[in-house]
Each structure stands twice: as structure tokens, then as C-alpha cells.
């Protein structure tokens, strides 16, 4: 089985604008519904989850100029295994990240082996 990293993405303004239009009670209900659905997704796909990952915090960028703050749209990640890239992607169809919560999408990429230096 191949390993894939799925990155949950969300831009601060897009989905959040609609989320913020909800009343406090509606947001609480949606939050509970989303957490329940996410838990059900984790349970359903338990055998394919290699590492559950989690939410991601603020980003720092390091380059030749040093260290600086960086804004990105990465919200969280999970590592799954599947027989193909497409099979891995299918795990995230209608995922609660964007079907209930205000997330934009989930990007799935294969975790490739580290190239080995020829002897």
C-alpha cells in the first residue's frame, strides 16, 4: 500500500463568511454535527489511517533572508494508505471539513520514498 498525505485547506475569508453569518446556536449545532461526522469518518477509515495528524498552527518560513511569518491555507493533515492516488482521494469525498465545516478542500499527495544516493 502507498502512503498519502491529505492536507485540509481553508482560506480565512471564503467559507468563514457564511459560517460567521450563522447564529451562535446554529454554529454550536454545526460544530457538534461536524465533530460527530469527523469522528465517524475516522472510525470508518480507521484501517487506512496511518497517522491521524491534526490541526496546524501558524506558519513560519525560513529562507536565505532568515525567518518570517507566512500565511498559508493549510489547516490540518492526516496520513492514509491506499492502493492508488485515486483510492486515497475517494476517502475524502464529502468529508466534513468542507461538507459541514467552512473548509475549502482536501489536497491529497503521495508520500514518496527519499531518494537514495548511488554508492
Indicate where each model-derived feature is located.
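Conserved, structured core segments of small domains
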Residues: 1-119
